Design a protein with these regions (language model features):
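N-terminal loops that bind phosphate or other acidic moieties
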Residues: 1-144
Length: 144
């Protein structure tokens, strides 16, 4: 099973982890690391390295980050380039996190990356778009 390290600015990681646990329960091979305003790049690097050491990395590690180009993304990317079998996904939302935590057992790192990007795109929509899609595809009884 792929291991997941979730990281992001402020309380992003711990907040997403809390929401995930509320819906899916406790998950193995998963660590959330916040990057609060009082932290530093060096400290985040150390925390991510420690997380890698704690996880079973045999099947690979996926870093899920909040923002392209942000410190958590850059640090995760640097570490991933040093360790074969690592992937970095950015722009993480709750739908992506939930779906991919459930799917990761049967996926390689590359398959995870491709599926996560599709999931993230699918999860970003609007009420108008969903109502239009549902009007075309769904029987009246079904709803969104």
């Amino acid at each position: 099973m792929l291991s997941i390290i979730l990281t992001g600015h402020g309380g992003f990681a711990s907040g997403m982890e809390k929401a995930m646990k509320q819906i899916l329960g406790e998950q193995s091979q998963f660590i959330a690391i916040d990057f609060p305003e009082t932290s530093s790049t060096a400290l985040l690097t150390s925390q991510l390295e420690e997380a890698i050491a704690q996880l079973d990395c045999e099947d690979g590690i996926v870093f899920l980050t909040d923002l392209l180009g942000g410190t958590p993304f850059r640090v995760a990317s640097t570490l991933a380039m040093q360790k074969p079998g690592c992937e970095v996904i950015t722009g993480t939302n709750l739908q992506l996190l939930l779906e991919m935590v459930l799917e990761r057992e049967w996926l390689s790192g590359e398959e995870f990356r491709v599926q996560a990007l599709e999931c993230g795109h699918r999860g970003l929509t609007s009420l108008v778009d969903e109502l239009g899609r549902c009007h075309e595809e769904c029987p009246v009884e079904e709803g969104i």
